Amino acid sequence: MSHKISPALKNLPDIDSWISIDVAIRGAQYHFIHIKRLLDMFDTGATKISVSQMNWLIRGFFWELVGAFDLILQWVNKRFQLEVESNKTRKWETIDVGRVQWSRVKRSRAKIAPDLWNNVIQYLIQVWESEWYFEVRTYRNYAHKSLFEMTEFTRTDGKGNSQWFISLAREGQGYDDLRILLPSYIEEFERLAANLKDLTGK
């Protein structure tokens, strides 16, 4: 049996892509607020349901961030009219979102502002190859396949909160408490969005 995607979910809606990108980054912040709340509760004794909730939230956190990067790809495809789409349809009013993937975008030429596109894609390649985005992608991919195991480090002096860790995503990555690690990824994404807006005059 062959199924076809509904046009409503196949084509890019006519909205400002930066709204969607900002919504995804705010979505990760929302998840972190609730993750931090649960971590604070864990210090008084975690329940089985709160462990499940933690996994839902951590998985959602990384899905939102990778979603933000995918939305950036949709934006650059539309903004620069990349050959990702023009090779197939030559129409820019119907952009097939499924075709807009990193493997295609990074080698595409721009119909609009090709010199600016060269600067933008070089910056996006730096982000893609960065340690932090490798970690985010790895955590997101892992979240599709398994739940996260958490390790607690409890202070023996009883002063201060426990520290909570998930497994390392990258060889050579340092261990950081989730209260430090997760906000650092949000900060990187905020920097990415701000730099792209500055670079493109958005």
How would you label these PLM feature ranges?
Residues M1-R37, T44-W63, L71-K202:
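Acidic, Ser/Thr/Gly/Pro-rich intrinsically disordered interaction regions
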